[in-house]
Design a protein with these regions (language model features):
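Short consensus segments that form the blades of beta-propeller domains
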Residues: 84-95, 126-131, 158-164
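Structural signature of eukaryotic scaffold interfaces centered on beta-propeller domains
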Residues: 63-70, 137-145
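Acidic/hydrophobic-patterned starts of short beta strands in beta-sheet-rich repeat architectures
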Residues: 70-78, 144-155
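Bacterial N-terminal signal peptides that target proteins for export
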Residues: 2-18
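C-terminal motif of bacterial Sec signal peptides marking the signal peptidase cleavage site
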Residues: 25-28
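Surface-exposed loop and turn segments in beta-propeller and other repeat-based domains
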Residues: 114-130, 190-201
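Acidic, small-residue rich beta-repeat scaffolds with periodic aromatic anchors
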Residues: 30-69, 166-168, 173-235
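Repeat-based blade/solenoid architectures
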Residues: 48, 55-61, 122-136
Length: 235
């Protein structure tokens, strides 16, 4: 089996806050979806937006556009690739890069400001490299009804062969505070995903509002089913 670097660490990315939550209560949304009203939060569609440039480019996988008490926000999700030198000196490594950026503005026609950027980088010597945002679990919500949007991100990464685990990452950002869970899932002999290996939680989750903990646990449980499809496609 080819050498494999350790999987990317989500917990380290949570400083100072890691990364849309389930759009409109665990329903996927996209640029063409209609507006959805949530307590203290409005999810916006392309039809709601004035004809001015939006953050992102043609390679953007998903935009989640919302309005909360601070103004407008747009979460932009992308996936890119790179090649780096192997630190062991044995050639090169492919790298899959998942990038999430949050842009905000105080009102229509105002300029967009990038509030934060988060990346998950998966280097791999092969034979299989995967990295994907799990878009059905990404969006914006106002779970604690304070008028400020929280952002949830969910993703999966993989490097290796059929016996190697898939890494799962889920996180929620509320203002400047991030909460996250990461762990592993494998395919069993029947081709079903199962959680095993270590599971890590960000230290901040111990003091998180219960509604945030419940939300993250619900998304985490759903990732096992979602990752089965990705795992089967990889092998």
């Amino acid at each position: 089996m080819n050498a494999r670097l350790p999987p990317p660490g989500l917990i380290g990315l949570l400083r100072p806050a890691l990364l849309g939550t389930v759009c409109a209560a665990l329903a996927a949304c996209n640029d063409a979806a209609p507006s959805a009203q949530l307590p203290g939060l409005t999810l916006l569609s392309a039809q709601d937006v004035a004809a001015d440039p939006m953050p992102g480019n043609d390679d953007t996988l998903r935009r989640v556009h919302y309005r909360d008490l601070h103004g407008e926000g747009v979460l932009v999700l992308e996936r890119s690739a790179a090649v780096i030198n192997d630190p062991t000196g044995s050639g090169s490594l492919d790298v899959a890069i998942l990038t999430a950026r949050l842009y905000v503005r105080s009102g229509p026609r105002k300029g967009w400001t990038k509030l934060w950027q988060r990346q998950i980088r998966q280097p791999c010597a092969g034979p299989v490299l995967e990295a994907a945002w799990l878009l059905q679990h990404v969006g914006a919500t106002d779970l604690d009804d304070d008028g400020q949007a929280e952002i949830t991100l969910a993703s999966h990464t993989f490097c290796g062969n059929g016996s190697d685990p898939h890494q799962l990452h889920v996180s929620l950002i509320d203002g400047s505070t991030g909460y996250g869970i990461e762990g592993e899932t494998r395919l069993d002999a029947a081709g079903q995903a199962r959680f095993d290996g270590e599971r890590h939680q960000s230290p901040s989750l111990a003091s998180a509002p219960p509604v945030f903990v419940q939300h993250l646990e619900k998304v985490w449980s759903a990732l096992g089913d979602t990752s089965t499809t990705h795992a089967r496609q990889a092998h």
